[in-house]
Amino acid sequence: LEHLLDSHIGELEPLALGGADVEEDLTRVGTAFLGAILSEESLAICRMVIAEMKRFPDLGQRFFDLGPMRAYAAFSGYLRHQQAAGTLDIADPDLTARQLLESLGGDLHMRAMLLNGPAPEPEDLERYVRNAVRIFLKGASSRPSSPT
């Protein structure tokens, strides 16, 4: 469990450095994150944790701390960096990071958990993430948005 989560959450580490293009940073790392949580291995672990939580109450907390909380922290750090740079105007980076990460997956994670259908194609994942990132940036940009 720890090894799997380390390998997936490690993909978020470059995000903390902060590139010049926020939209591309968030899209690139968000697509990698979504691909990771939708992998067969991740879905199997998540299903197992949910199934065994009653017998092993600490398992859910451990999974949450090693997975989602680390992802939220990585995104929050990035948002704080962009906020300090004046690129983003957000009141609560921690809350915003959680909301942004959850919006990236939309219904895809729930569908994958429950419907057991084919995984989305990589280009579909990127399109899904790019849309969520654009919506996020319209609300969080410190610059006036250009007319579209």
Task: Report residues per predicted region.
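Amphipathic alpha-helical segments used for helix-helix packing
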Residues: 37-65, 109-114
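Short, surface-exposed loop/turn segments at secondary-structure junctions
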Residues: 61-62, 90, 116-119
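Membrane-interface starts of transmembrane alpha-helices
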Residues: 89, 93-97
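Alpha-helical structural segments
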Residues: 1-36, 40, 62-77, 127, ...
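Short alpha-helical
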Residues: 7, 44, 54, 58, ...
